[in-house]
């Protein structure tokens, strides 16, 4: 289903990616409750789409799980099986470099420091 949903936008997505690395950022709120995570089949649909537009040569799946070790979540949800079929790498964003940026809270209108992954902030990432 994801593959078919992306197909009408193939040209635009291919052009937008250009020569950049593709970062797939699933949402893993929990590392052991499947309903709190992006399903591996969803990621596979995206990977198949990227393959169809010849943008599968530099893809990473990157996450920072909310309640435990990210790689445990990847294992629990079957993400690692994707590496047997696609040339994808896995990144635990908690173990990568980060930048501190300040965001404003509407309750107190004060800046609060927040860690942002350098992987996600990189202009070389899409």
Regions found by a protein language model. Name each.
Residues 1-126:
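N-terminal and secondary-structure boundary signal
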């Amino acid at each position: 289903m994801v593959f078919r949903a992306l197909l009408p936008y193939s040209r635009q997505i291919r052009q937008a990616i250009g020569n950049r690395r593709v970062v797939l950022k699933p949402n893993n709120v929990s590392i052991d409750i499947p309903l709190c995570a992006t399903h591996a089949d969803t990621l596979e649909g995206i990977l198949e789409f990227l393959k169809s537009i010849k943008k599968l040569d530099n893809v990473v799946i990157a996450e920072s799980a909310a309640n435990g070790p990210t790689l445990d979540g990847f294992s629990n949800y079957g993400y690692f099986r994707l590496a047997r079929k696609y040339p994808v790498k896995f990144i635990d964003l908690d173990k990568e470099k980060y930048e501190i940026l300040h965001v404003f809270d509407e309750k107190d209108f004060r800046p609060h420091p927040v860690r942002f992954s350098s992987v996600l902030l990189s202009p070389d990432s899409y």
